[in-house]
């Protein structure tokens, strides 16, 4: 009988401790909970990206120097920002879609200077991002976010998440998941670009 009472007391104590830890954790996350997930009409928060990986990436983004930069320094009217995870199978499927979108944009003289693409690897370290870029033949700049700082500023969106943003930071479109119809998606991007002019 004593063992039974001791066991009940032990479990009751564990419940109280866990509840207390959960309450402290919830209080600590109060500020993080206030960050809304990015949505159409919102303004993209400022965040810093690593220096471009090469002078060709620097030139593509229209940056003056090979130094860390903010999205607001990118020389474009529209920025396509892809948030992905290096271990995400859906993100891997989205890779070829984005490569095709990039090619469509670069092949269109009316769009190639006005629309730029970048990717941010939520939780991804530079080495894994480099491997991703090589394996999937990604032609546009990718940036690591090993501490998920950028991802958290964006409100922890599910991945893959494609944002279409104006150069002033207004979010015009948000797409979650793999894009099923690449041609239609490109037409939408082109229309968004033309509507911004």
Regions found by a protein language model. Give the residues of each.
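Short, internal strand/loop/helix patches
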Residues: 118, 130-165
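Bacterial N-terminal signal peptides
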Residues: 10-20
């Amino acid at each position: 009988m004593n063992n039974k009472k001791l066991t009940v007391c032990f479990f009751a104590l564990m419940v109280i401790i866990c509840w207390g830890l959960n309450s402290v954790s919830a209080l600590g996350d109060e500020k993080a909970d206030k960050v809304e997930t990015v949505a159409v009409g919102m303004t993209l928060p400022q965040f810093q990206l690593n220096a471009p990986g090469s002078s060709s990436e620097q030139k593509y983004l229209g940056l003056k120097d090979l130094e860390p930069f903010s999205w607001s320094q990118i020389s474009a009217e529209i920025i396509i920002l892809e948030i992905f995870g290096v271990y995400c199978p859906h993100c891997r499927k989205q890779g070829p879609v984005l490569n095709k979108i990039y090619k469509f944009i670069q092949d269109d003289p009316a769009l190639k200077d006005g629309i730029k693409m970048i990717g941010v690897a939520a939780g991804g370290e530079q080495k894994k991002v480099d491997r991703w870029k090589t394996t999937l033949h990604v032609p546009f700049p990718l940036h690591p976010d090993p501490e998920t700082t950028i991802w958290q500023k964006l409100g922890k969106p599910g991945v893959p998440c494609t944002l279409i943003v104006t150069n002033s930071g207004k979010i015009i479109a948000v797409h979650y998941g793999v894009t099923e119809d690449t041609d239609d998606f490109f037409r939408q991007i082109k229309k968004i670009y033309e509507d911004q002019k």
